[in-house]
Amino acid sequence: MEVYLSENAFIGLLVSALEVYRRECFGILLGHSTPDRVFVEFAVPYQSANRKYREVHIDWKRSQRVEEAVRSTTRWECIGDYHSHSKFGLRRATTQLSNEDKQHFSEGTVGVVVAVNDIRKPRPWSYVKGGTLSGSVNGYSIRIAAYYKSNDHIARAHVVSPYAIGFMEKRQDLFRRSIQ
Ligand SMILES: [Zn+2]
């Protein structure tokens, strides 16, 4: 399974995760899906998410209301959700799903996890082993991983974001040139 992130979705995930760092964000993913590809067009943050440092709980009734609103007003579908993991004390954030993440994972949907940590040196955006997208923004290290649940089994999906790899790399080249 491949999970494509559009420019809007990629920026949405970054802004949403960085805004609340070191707390954790939660939101829904809008887009469309085919049997082996999911296209994420938008990442929409939930303002009502009761953000704690370790876990994010949301009001599930409200979530259903949002899904119905999306279905009746846009051509996109709710294809899954996302949340961030933040560095906690000395423990660095990872993109691994917690037990609670697994419990709340709905069948047939995609779950994106954005891990945010402090970092000293900027790092170009690239794909790392297992299909994770990794890079940095303004002193924060970001890793974006995706999972997909089918037949009651949660598997890792490959994150694909031409925008992140191409455009961000060019930006960093320009930046490097301008400081030399
Ligand atoms: Zn989690």
Give each language-model segment a name:
Residues 1-80, 84-180:
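MPN/JAMM (Mov34/JAB) isopeptidase/deubiquitinase module and associated MPN-bearing subunits/adaptors
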